[in-house]
Regions:
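TPR/TPR-like (Sel1-like) alpha-helical repeat modules
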Residues: 198-216
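N-terminal cysteine/histidine-rich coordination modules
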Residues: 18-97
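Alpha-helical junction/boundary sensor with strong preference for TPR arrays
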Residues: 123, 127-130, 167-175, 211-215
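Terminal, low-structured helical/coil segments at or just beyond the last alpha-helical repeat
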Residues: 216-247
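Amphipathic alpha-helical repeat scaffolds of TPR domains
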Residues: 92-152, 179-194, 232, 236
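Sec-dependent N-terminal signal peptides
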Residues: 4-16
Length: 247
């Protein structure tokens, strides 16, 4: 009996680890107010993150997880974790002025205790000061919509997804993103689906399925990999929508 329990325990651990994502603590200094605080950094993950349900919103781990948006508990400066330490010096004064207007409901000792959508709302204004391109904003509002949805704020989630949709359309008409239409049309389909426009979503999925993804800035193997992933995901998405309609 003990052997069976032990074997089952090992099987459980192996199953858990196959899909596990891990974080570890690391101290960072806020580039605005110089406050030192313990944040979380990525430990481990695998390709399984691209097969989680958030793929239907074209949002992936780590941005689906709470530690991914850093926020200084003192001045409330907030960005994605990978941008936190690389803020241009010439933006600090403007950021300081903006952050002086940010008022939270209470003081937080740990950044993880600050609601994710609150951090994203601050980060939205921070990134407006820093300046970002259409692709960034298209993704940012998908992420924001995802987290509003997680908090069951359907109205805010829809607002964010409509913004993502607007940026995706801008990308579609911009020659900078030439060759990436398959991915952009998929994003448009995904956002349409999550604002309740399922018929439009299916139309855009059909359009995307006829294309091949291209990106001259990437290695050929990476381009091929994303194209194959999108092809498979489009098929899955059509089935996903049909199943939703049957429920």
């Amino acid at each position: 009996m003990k052997k069976i329990v032990l074997i089952l325990g090992v099987v459980f651990l192996l199953t858990f680890n196959v899909n596990a994502t891990t974080w570890f603590p690391s101290e960072h200094t806020c580039p605005v107010c110089k406050h030192k605080h313990e944040y979380q950094e990525i430990g481990s993950y695998g390709g399984y993150i691209y097969h989680r349900p958030s793929k239907y919103q074209y949002v992936y781990w780590p941005l689906t997880d709470f530690p991914s948006v850093y926020c200084c508990p003192k001045c409330h400066f907030a960005t994605y974790m990978w941008d936190f330490d690389s803020i241009p010096e010439n933006k600090v004064d403007t950021l300081t002025k903006f952050l002086s207007t940010v008022k939270l409901e209470k003081k937080y000792k740990d950044y993880l205790d600050i609601p994710m959508t609150t951090r994203l709302e601050i980060a939205e204004n921070v990134y407006k000061i820093l300046g970002q391109d259409n692709e960034f904003w298209c993704k940012f509002y998908r992420v924001q919509g995802y987290h509003y949805d997680q908090e069951e704020n359907k109205e805010k989630a829809k607002e964010s997804r409509l913004k993502s949709l607007d940026y995706a359309r801008l990308m579609l008409s911009d020659s900078v993103y030439s060759g990436q239409e398959k991915e952009i049309l998929f994003i448009i389909a995904a956002m349409n689906n999550f604002i309740g426009q399922k018929d439009s979503a299916l139309i855009y999925l059909d359009k995307a399925s006829l294309l091949t993804y291209e990106n001259k800035k990437w290695k050929e193997e990476n381009v091929k990999g994303l194209d194959e992933y999108l092809t498979d995901l489009i098929k899955q998405y059509k089935e996903f929508i049909r199943k939703e309609d049957e429920e």
